[in-house]
Amino acid sequence: MTTPQHPEDFLHAIRTRSAAEDGIFWVDDTRLGVFEPEAARRVSATNWRRFVLPDRLIDMLRRRRSPEVRWSQIRSAWLTQLHTLATAEHHGSLIDRMERIIDERLGEDVDLVMLTQDVALRSMLPVALSGLTSGESELVRRDLEMKLLRLVSPEPAGTWHHLRFVVVQLRSGLVVRRVLRQRAHGKRGRELDLADPFVDLLPQLGMDRALDVVTTVLTAIGGPPGTAAASLLYEFVRHPDWQRRLTEELGAVDPVEFRTTPTHAAPVTHRFVKEVLRLWSPPLLLVRRNDFPFDFGKTRLEPGDWYLLSPHLIHRDERVWKRPDVFDPDRFLPGAPHGPADRTCYVPFGWAPKKCVGANIGTVQLMGLCHLLCTRYRLTVEHPEKLTMALRFAPVPEGFRGRLALR
C-alpha cells in the first residue's frame, strides 16, 4: 500500500497479520485492528448507539450543555429525504448531469481519475446542496476538490497550499451558512436536497452544528463516489468480456425501468458494480475511538482505546471469501459457492446501523455511469492490461488516461 506519508506496503503486512491472528490484533501500541467481520460489526454498532453531536460553540463558551441531538436523528432526516429522491425523475436527472459533464471532455486525452471525480462530484452536488449560484457552487466544489487532493497527493502539501485550503474551506462554510439562513428566513426557496431538513432544525441545532451536518454530507460526496467511479472504469477497461455482457444487457433494458429501479432492471450490471466495490471500496482503513469495553478473548478493547476497521481487508479475507483477489461479479449470483459467507462479510458502505446513507444513490450513480459507457460513449485506454492500482487513502488507478467518444 502506498500513501503520502507511508511508502511501504503496510496494508499487505496488516493483511498477512490478520490472516495469521484471526482478524483481531494490536497494529501498534495504541490501535487495535478489528478485521474479523462479526467483531467489526459488533464494535461499530455498539459505539454508534449513543453517538451525539457536540455542543454548540456558544454553549461551550458559556459552559453549558446544548440540547442533545443524536446522529441517529440526523441519519433519519437524510434517509427520509433520500427516499423522496429515489424516483425515476431524480435518478434520470443525476444521470443526465453526468452525461453533460462527460460531453464537455469528449475527444480529449484525459486523466480518468480526475474526470470521474469531477463527474461524480458535480452530478451529486445538487443532491447534497442545490439552488446555488454559479459562484457559490464553484466555492463549494473548490473546497471539496482541495480536500480530495490533500488525500490522494503522493507528497505532503506545503504551507502555502495549507493556507489556501483553510481560506477556501472558510469561504465554503460561509456559503452553507448563508444558504441555511436565507432558507430559514424565506429569502431563498426550499430545495429537495440533503441540507434542507436541517433548516427546520436550526433552533435545536444552532448554526454551527447545522453547518457541521451539511459539511459532513458534502465531504461524503467529495471523494468516495469519484474514487469508486474511477475503480469502476479501471475494471471496465481491463475486462472486455464484462464490457460485452454489460453492453448486451444495458442496450436492451427499458430506459424508464432502468431509471426507476436500476438494480432490478439490470442485475448483471448490479453484480459488476458490487464486485468493483468489494475489491476497491474506499476508504481502505477507518480509525475510531472506542467508548465501551469489549472482550475478544485474547485481548480487550477498553473505553478510550483506538481501533481500526477495514471493509477492504474483510473483502480480501480468504477465511470468508473464496478467491478474494479475483474479479468475478458472478460471485453475487444466488447460491454462488464463492460468494460472501454471510451478510457481515460484504460491507462496502460500512456497518449497520451506521451504514452510509448514500449507499442506494451511490449505487444508482455507478450503474448510471455503466449505462452511459455502454450505450452513449466508447472509452479507449491504451494497454489496459498494464494498469496498476495505488492504495492511498483509497484505491487510485495509476497513470489512468484515456479518451471518450460518442458511439
Regions picked out by a protein language model, each given a short descriptive name:
Residues 222-249, 357-377:
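Cytochrome P450 catalytic-core helices
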Residues 48, 309-337, 359:
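Conserved cytochrome P450 K-helix/beta-meander segment immediately N-terminal to the heme-binding cysteine loop
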Residues 261, 320, 333-398:
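Cytochrome P450 heme-thiolate "Cys pocket" and heme-binding signature region
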Residues 37-38, 47-48, 56-98, 113, ...:
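Cytochrome P450
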Residues 88-227:
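Cytochrome P450 heme-thiolate monooxygenase catalytic core
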Residues 2-16, 255-297:
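Conserved cytochrome P450 K-helix E-x-x-R motif and the immediately C-terminal K′/meander segment
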Residues 1-60, 345:
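N-terminal membrane-proximal hinge/A-helix region immediately C-terminal to the signal-anchor transmembrane segment
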